[in-house]
Design a protein with these regions (language model features):
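Metalloprotease/metallohydrolase-associated module, dominated by Zn2+-dependent proteases
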Residues: 2-36, 41-45, 49-52, 56, ...
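Active-site recognition of the HExxH zinc-binding catalytic motif
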Residues: 75-87, 123
Length: 154
């Protein structure tokens, strides 16, 4: 395992986010398996929230699909692995309020929780199944009139 992944693994163990991920996996009756780079994957997650097909808490990736279906979606796994790194950088569960703030910011700008969410953009929008959305019309007009980039701005 590369040094960066060992650091992520240790950071998420120390900051408690991986333990939280294991508790969420247990609550959702997910079946856990080891994955590459110090990650764990819980498949057949059963709780109704969140509605996403996959999500990450610490070094634990949780998915509603079975292992075969998830393994065939390498870009999604890479996207979720990037979220594990974000947990390490944000000090663990401190990432959650930051993530929700970024999601609200994105929704305010575009009407979509992921399109302008800096965590989703850094993890790779397309890899996570998200698409870029334009600014809401009023915001786009304001951006154009103030000389700021509108539609293509991040």
């Amino acid at each position: 395992m590369r040094a960066a992944y060992r650091v992520r693994l240790m950071a998420n163990l120390v900051n408690g986010s991986t333990l939280a991920g294991l508790l969420v996996a247990a609550a959702g009756r997910a079946r856990l398996a080891r994955a590459a780079d110090g990650l764990l994957v819980g498949v057949r997650y059963r709780l109704p929230v969140p509605v996403a097909p996959a999500f990450t808490v610490g070094n634990v990736i949780l998915a509603r699909a079975d292992w075969a279906a998830l393994a065939s979606r390498e870009p999604l796994l890479a996207h979720e692995a990037r979220h594990a790194t974000q947990y390490a950088w944000c000090g663990g569960l401190f990432m959650l309020p930051l993530y929700f703030l970024a999601a609200g910011f994105s929704w305010g700008l575009t009407g979509d929780f992921g399109a302008r969410n800096l965590f989703e953009r850094q993890a790779g929008l397309a890899d996570g199944g998200y698409s870029d959305k334009p600014l809401r019309p009023l915001l786009a007009r304001f951006a154009r009139s103030s000389g700021q980039p509108g539609e293509g701005a991040a």
